[in-house]
Amino acid sequence: MKNLILICAFIVGLSTYAQNTIKQDLGDFNTLKVYNGIELELVKSSSQKIEITGEKANLVKIKNVNNTLKLSLPFSLKPSDNSAEGKILVKLYYNKNIDLIDVNEGATITGKNFNQDKVSLNAQERGFINLTTKTKYLSIRATSGGIIKVSGTSKNQEVDLDLYGIYHGFNLQSTGNTNVKAGTGAKAEVNAGETLNAKVSFGGTIFYKGNPEVVKDKKVIGGIIEKRN
């Protein structure tokens, strides 16, 4: 009898897992946007597909229009259904370049070995991006408490932060040009290569490592530009 109960519990567990696992093939896309606290992992693959697990997996809205893939939750009058709350985990398998990665509303995107010639990373509304990459041109934009962390290599990087946006880039080796702007309450950490063009305003902060041959800095109404060892 005890064994029968255990077997039934195991079957129910498998059924529950299956109900909360969604798999779907995807068409082409070059822009990725994620919302509502959804946690997503990028996985380089030979095909394009998505796998969603977690208690709220069935709530995720997948929309792929005009090469833009959006993952979000539909609006609900029940506040708890408007946020993933750690109950949605997504694995996104891709085989083509993703030109723009954009996180919003506390969503998270992570990935390793994200290697392509150029990529733009945007984070806002407490969204978080954490990537390891090898690229020639990297564009960073963070605002409204968005956080971006990048390690690896890039020839050139363009960083634009405002409204308490944060960029952790000390572990990104840049060999060429680094242009950084940090506005209200924003903070940038960069590893500069040949040149550094830094501009802060309204209490922004830029910390940099490396020994750039040319350093141009401009401060407007406060702010900090400082070299770190």
Set out the residue ranges of the language-model regions.
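Short, surface-exposed interaction patches in beta-rich subdomains
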Residues: 148-229
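First exposed extracellular module after export/assembly in secreted or surface-exposed proteins
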Residues: 58, 128-131, 190, 205
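Sec-dependent N-terminal signal peptides
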Residues: 4-14
